């Protein structure tokens, strides 16, 4: 047990913290995905563009699909988030240790943290993209949708059958752009933590819950706001409805086409669809995840060193 924990403290701590946080905040993730994927009417008719907001989306879901729909895709969301955070933090700490050993230092600077975070994010993308793709499609589908997914494995099976193995990696390019999200978030998080530590005289491991909450909230807000448009582009590419419709016309043909059509039909604001529910979800989610991560990591380290 101690051997396993000693080699997976960060990954296991992040996985557990993310699982708890994601389960409580699932409805906000559902709304974010619905709003990011909105813009064109069902069937991909470019002449039926319409704008929808948070309130209208909530009303439509409650009226036509029921309250349970807010938790549709919760299983893949929880699984995806847990694996993503666990994988990310495991490799983030691993890359940090590599640089510390290379430079023979105990504390890395902000740029080093940025590089480690981007590297960890890229590694995590290739491992988890198929799961996030199925999660996204399950949240965008409605009862009666073509190729309706009943679960993660059913979604993977149908995706491979219809689109081939490469279909599981739709949206991977904008996902790789989003590796800078992890870079901005974690370098900011580490910098703010170091600021609190320097001004209070406490060690980084001794920071209290409020300091961790502030550091995680600010860092997540910065990263999310700056790079949010890439999330919208990724969601549009992954949306199952963007496969040829009944008229055999594709809504989007690649990343450049998505960007062009969003600008043409929705304007700049189209790149920020779902930002409000996303902010309401990701900031508390990240704060809770990192709070639990830090506390669980302390507990695991105590067990290992006991």
Swiss-Prot record:
Residue intervals passing through the bilayer: 11-31, 73-89, 114-134, 164-184, 212-232, 279-296
GO CC term (a single one): mitochondrion
Lineage: superkingdom: Eukaryota
Gene Ontology biological process: transmembrane transport
Protein name: Mitochondrial substrate carrier family protein M
Annotated compartments: Mitochondrion inner membrane
Alphabetical UniProt keywords: Membrane, Mitochondrion, Mitochondrion inner membrane, Repeat, Transmembrane, Transmembrane helix, Transport
Stretches in topological domain Mitochondrial intermembrane: 1-10, 90-113, 185-211, 297-306
GO terms, molecular function: FAD transmembrane transporter activity; folic acid transmembrane transporter activity
A Pfam family that the UniProt record links to this protein: Mito_carr
């Amino acid at each position: 047990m101690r051997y396993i924990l000693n080699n997976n403290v960060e990954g296991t701590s992040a996985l557990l913290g993310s699982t708890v946080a994601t389960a409580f905040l699932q409805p906000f993730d559902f709304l974010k995905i619905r709003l990011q994927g909105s813009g064109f009417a069902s069937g991909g008719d470019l002449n039926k563009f319409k704008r929808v907001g948070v309130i209208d989306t909530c009303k439509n879901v409650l009226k036509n699909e029921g309250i349970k729909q807010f938790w549709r895709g919760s299983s893949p969301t929880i699984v995806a988030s847990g694996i993503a955070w666990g994988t990310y933090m495991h490799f983030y700490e691993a890359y940090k240790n590599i640089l510390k050993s290379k430079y023979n230092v105990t504390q890395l600077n902000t740029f080093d943290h940025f590089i480690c975070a981007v590297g960890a994010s890229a590694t995590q993308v290739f491992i988890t993209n198929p799961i996030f793709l199925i999660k996204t499609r399950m949240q965008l589908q409605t009862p009666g949708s073509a190729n309706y997914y009943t679960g993660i494995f059913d979604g993977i099976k149908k995706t491979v059958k219809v689109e081939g193995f490469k279909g599981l990696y739709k949206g991977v390019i904008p996902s790789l752009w989003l590796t800078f999200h992890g870079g901005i978030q974690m370098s900011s998080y580490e910098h703010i933590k170091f600021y609190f530590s320097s001004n209070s005289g406490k060690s980084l491991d001794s920071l209290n819950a409020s300091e961790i909450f502030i550091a995680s909230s600010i860092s997540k807000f910065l990263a999310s706001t700056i790079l949010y448009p890439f999330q919208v582009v990724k969601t549009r590419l992954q949306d199952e409805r963007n496969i040829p419709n009944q008229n055999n016309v594709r809504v989007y043909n690649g990343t450049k086409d998505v960007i062009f059509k969003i600008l043409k039909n929705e304007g700049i604001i189209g790149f920020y669809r779902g930002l409000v529910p996303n902010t309401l979800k990701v900031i508390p989610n990240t704060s809770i995840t990192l709070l639990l991560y830090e506390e669980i990591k302390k507990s695991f380290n105590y067990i290992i060193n006991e």
